[in-house]
């Protein structure tokens, strides 16, 4: 999450979000014990505060939800919001639940985080590396290095991007 938000802070890409998406992220991250309830709540509160311009209100996409493809009805609001926001890509680790071809016909590309970050690295190599270095420098408790940031991405399941970014450090 830090890297995606940092890239948005540095204007390398734009993060769009909904209240529903942040609420779901918070529930999942707590359930999977990847963050404490307090830490998860502080992350979503920070996104709401610092990335308020990326918020897509329910009334902007509600009318699209029933038209969205896919078996999982819980994912349809995310697709509808991305389309309403005119997002270039819907980045998810769960690409199987987001039918690529029907969404592409609606102008939305579904892509996993490893591929997406690799594309950003190809298009903006210096900026992406500078963001990773900045994020690491801002971590003080405990201190982190850029390699630590990339190792955290490996731990989150990214395979190629951390190695490619490490080569550029």
Question: What would you call each of these model-derived segments?
Answer:
Residues 52-89, 143, 155-169:
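Active-site neighborhoods of divalent-metal-dependent phosphate/nucleic-acid chemistry enzymes
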Residues 76-109:
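Acidic, metal-binding active-site segment of PIN/NYN-like and related structure-specific nucleases
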């Amino acid at each position: 999450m830090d890297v995606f938000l940092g890239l948005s802070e540095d204007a390398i890409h734009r993060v769009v979000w909904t209240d529903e998406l942040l609420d779901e992220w918070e529930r999942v991250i707590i359930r999977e014990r990847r963050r404490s309830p307090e830490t998860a709540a502080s992350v979503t509160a920070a996104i709401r505060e610092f990335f308020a311009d990326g918020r897509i209100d329910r009334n902007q996409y509600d009318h699209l939800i029933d038209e969205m493809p896919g078996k999982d009805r819980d994912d349809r609001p995310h697709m509808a919001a991305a389309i309403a926001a005119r997002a270039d890509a819907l980045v998810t680790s769960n690409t199987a639940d987001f039918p690529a071809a029907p969404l592409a016909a609606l102008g939305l590309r579904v892509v996993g985080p490893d591929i997406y970050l690799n594309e950003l690295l190809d298009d903006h190599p210096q900026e992406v590396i500078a963001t990773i270095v900045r994020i690491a420098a801002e971590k003080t408790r405990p201190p982190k290095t850029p390699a630590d940031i990339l190792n955290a991405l490996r731990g989150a399941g990214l395979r190629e991007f951390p190695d490619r970014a490490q080569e550029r450090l």
